[in-house]
């Protein structure tokens, strides 16, 4: 088949800038072949190379005594004691999910699960953080339903519990939804599998499903803005099969137990190209591939298509040669393809053969380690104008504005489509703060949360970045867990715009300050840029996924109070209404500065709660919606009314940080107050749980009426 001529138009269609193409010519000393152009395009795009963000990502704290492996591998690895490790990561599948919601979201789940089990871990938990356009937008309902169905369809069939996440709506996501998928797994700390190839002449083996044309160019598509050609990009979305993925998991874990694996890498973005280059680059080796050996499910596939296909449920492995028969038998047993498609070579070459032709012969290091890296111009986000006057509101009407909004309404419509109990180790399912999963066969448990408040980040990227980490810290602490580490999913607009790059830089600096202060190093992550449609960008959304440890389930703090329990707030309430949920939902105002985050107070208050967990019956962090929303959610989950005594809009709905709401039996309140005084931690009694009404500063409504609104608003908003 004749390959197309390399023209400026073809170069631009591959997402390469003229100066980048000139650099390619200088590196290889000639014009590239069509396949080589595709390989450079895939490896040098934002999705694979992080060329606009690498400079700043390097500044993040990534080490600590608990960290076994930080960023750079498929997922982060953290020690949880007793010879065990938790392996986790969060990454985006934003562009594919907007184009084809079901498959985009489903393959996002599949990809993050492979990142975890390719390192030798059995997945035990999943989460997802979803951002959609306003419910009235004509595309939103279709996207929401497709994304949720795709996540549930893949995760449920694979057999991993979905234990948490978040869902928000905002007009800034009308043209770009965000689908951030998280997965965590367990492995023996001394049986972690890495991706660096080693040894010359070692067989490179293709594992899993066959290669088709789905997803060709997916990584390049994910590194560009959308415009009116969006429908033409539908073929770049991958198609997933969770049952094949489940077989691939079992085959890989069995293979790993057979001492056959030198290195292993899943085929994700840019497929065979990226997995082979990463393995060779990390091992300082070259790779030779013979594409005639690649299992194909479609006829007449070209070298270009095979190298750039993003067909799902595939792995690439460097195998111990003497173990070929053992490895082949395992994959045949699981009815999966096993094919030797190449070998490691000593030269710094990426050599691609197809038929009797050399389709690509490139310096491998130039594709990865020496890919372009930019120091993009950026400008600091201007300080927000001071918040103007906020009228006093009827507290019940303020609460109704929040619980009647799909962003804050009960999310049962979403969670009920996810299996949260498969594997029978889920202790806390979605809906009550952080998810909690038992570490099977031990007294331990792990807690999981994902958090960010994009309004804050837009108003003040530094404080917004800090707050995302601080809220994750509080959510883990509120279930009794000790926060261990984090993964970041950085979703931003076009980095070539200095104001957008400034948001990114500010958020990174805030995240870095918070993870350092709270001992929650970043161990993995993902960057998704160019989340814009026709030049309109999303809210800056640096999602933080976090994991915490309970050494025993005796440390678990419940989420539901009992009738008669006192409501107390740990922390200081100043009544910060800037960028608050109440302001946005009741008045349509996104004004003022984000609330400041005192990291020392965050740590001190969190440590106080964990140290005094035996004195409280239930706990929740205070964030969006302030005291009123958190207290309502806690009471409603238990089927209880409540009475809050603080008066004034700011006291009830302010979003001051470093605060927790706790429910405490009356006979333990005195001991808790004494402990707070001894620790120098502010503690204020604010009300009581019980009854059949919700009373806020004297205004009252039946719990049943509010609960009905709270539990119906989400489905009604999207026509569910």
From Swiss-Prot:
Keywords: ATP-binding, Cytoplasm, Ligase, Magnesium, Metal-binding, Nucleotide-binding, Purine biosynthesis. It comes from the Bacteria. Signal peptide: none annotated. One of its GO terms (cellular component) is cytoplasm. It is found in: Cytoplasm. PANTHER family: PHOSPHORIBOSYLFORMYLGLYCINAMIDINE SYNTHASE SUBUNIT PURL. This is Phosphoribosylformylglycinamidine synthase subunit PurL. The gene is purL.
């Amino acid at each position: 088949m004749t390959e197309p001529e390399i023209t400026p138009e073809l170069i631009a269609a591959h997402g390469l800038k003229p100066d980048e193409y000139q650099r390619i010519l200088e590196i290889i000393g000639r014009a590239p072949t069509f396949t080589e152009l595709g390989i450079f395009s895939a490896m040098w795009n934002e999705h694979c190379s992080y060329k606009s963000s690498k400079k700043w990502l390097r500044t993040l704290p990534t080490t600590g005594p608990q960290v076994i492996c930080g960023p750079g591998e498929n997922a982060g690895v953290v020690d949880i004691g007793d010879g065990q490790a938790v392996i986790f990561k969060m990454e985006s599948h934003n562009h594919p999910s907007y184009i084809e919601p079901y498959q985009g979201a489903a393959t996002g789940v599949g990809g993050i699960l492979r990142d975890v089990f390719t390192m030798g871990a059995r997945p035990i938990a999943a989460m997802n953080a979803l951002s959609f356009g306003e419910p009235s937008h004509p595309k939103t309902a279709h996207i929401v339903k497709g994304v949720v169905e795709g996540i549930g369809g893949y995760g449920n069939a694979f057999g991993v519990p979905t234990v948490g996440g978040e869902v928000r709506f905002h007009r800034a996501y009308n043209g770009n939804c965000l689908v951030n998928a998280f997965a965590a797994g367990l492995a023996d700390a001394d049986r972690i599998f890495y991706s660096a190839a080693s040894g010359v002449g070692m067989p490179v083996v293709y594992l899993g499903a066959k290669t088709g044309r789905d997803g060709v160019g997916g990584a390049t598509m994910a590194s560009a803005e959308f415009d009116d050609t969006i429908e033409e990009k539908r073929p770049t979305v991958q198609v997933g099969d969770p049952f094949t993925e489940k077989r691939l998991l079992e085959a890989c874990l069995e293979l790993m137990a057979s001492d056959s694996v030198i290195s292993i890498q899943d085929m994700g973005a840019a497929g065979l190209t990226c997995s082979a280059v990463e393995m060779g680059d990390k091992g300082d080796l070259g790779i030779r591939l013979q594409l005639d050996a690649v299992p194909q499910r479609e006829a007449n596939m070209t070298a270009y298509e095979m190298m750039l296909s993003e067909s799902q449920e595939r792995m690439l492995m460097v195998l111990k040669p003497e173990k070929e028969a053992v490895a082949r038998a395992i994959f045949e047993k699981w009815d999966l393809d096993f094919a030797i498609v190449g070998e490691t070579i000593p030269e710094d070459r990426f050599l691609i053969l197809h038929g009797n032709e050399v389709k690509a012969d490139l310096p491998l290091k130039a594709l990865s380690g020496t890919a372009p890296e930019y120091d993009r111009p950026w400008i600091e986000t201007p300080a927000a104008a001071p918040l103007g006057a906020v009228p006093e509101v009827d507290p019940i009407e303020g609460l109704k504005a929040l619980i009647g909004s799909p962003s804050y309404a009960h999310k049962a419509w979403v969670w009920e489509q996810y299996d949260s109990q498969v594997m029978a180790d889920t202790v806390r399912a979605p809906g009550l703060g952080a998810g909690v999963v038992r570490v099977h066969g031990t007294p331990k448990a792990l807690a999981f949360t994902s958090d960010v408040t994009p309004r804050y980040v837009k108003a003040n990227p530094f404080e917004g970045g800090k707050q995302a980490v601080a809220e994750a810290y509080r959510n883990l602490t509120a279930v009794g867990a000790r926060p261990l580490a984090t993964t970041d999913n950085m979703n931003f607009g076009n980095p070539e715009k200095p104001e957008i790059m400034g948001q990114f830089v500010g958020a990174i600096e805030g995240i870095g300050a918070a993870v350092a202060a709270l001992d929650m190093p970043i161990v993995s992550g993902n960057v998704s840029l160019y989340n814009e449609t026709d030049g309109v960008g999303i809210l800056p959304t640096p999602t933080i996924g976090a994991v915490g440890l309970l050494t025993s389930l005796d440390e678990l703090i419940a989420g539901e109070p009992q009738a008669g329990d006192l409501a107390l707030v740990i922390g200081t309430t100043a009544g910060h209404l800037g960028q608050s949920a109440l302001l946005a939902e009741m008045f349509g105002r996104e004004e003022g500065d984000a609330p400041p985050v005192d990291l020392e107070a965050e740590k001190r208050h969190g440590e106080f709660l964990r140290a005094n967990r035996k004195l409280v019956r239930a706990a929740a962090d205070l964030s969006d919606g302030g005291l009123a929303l958190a207290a309502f959610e806690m009471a409603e989950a238990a089927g209880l009314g409540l009475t809050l005594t603080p008066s004034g809009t700011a006291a009830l709905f302010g979003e001051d940080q470093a605060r927790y709401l706790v429910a405490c039996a009356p006979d333990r309140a005195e001991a808790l107050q004494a402990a707070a005084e001894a620790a120098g931690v502010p503690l204020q009694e604010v009300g009581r749980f019980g009854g059949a009404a919700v009373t806020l500063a004297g205004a009252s409504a039946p719990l049943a009426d509010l609960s009905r609104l709270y539990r119906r608003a989400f489905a009604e908003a999207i026509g569910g």
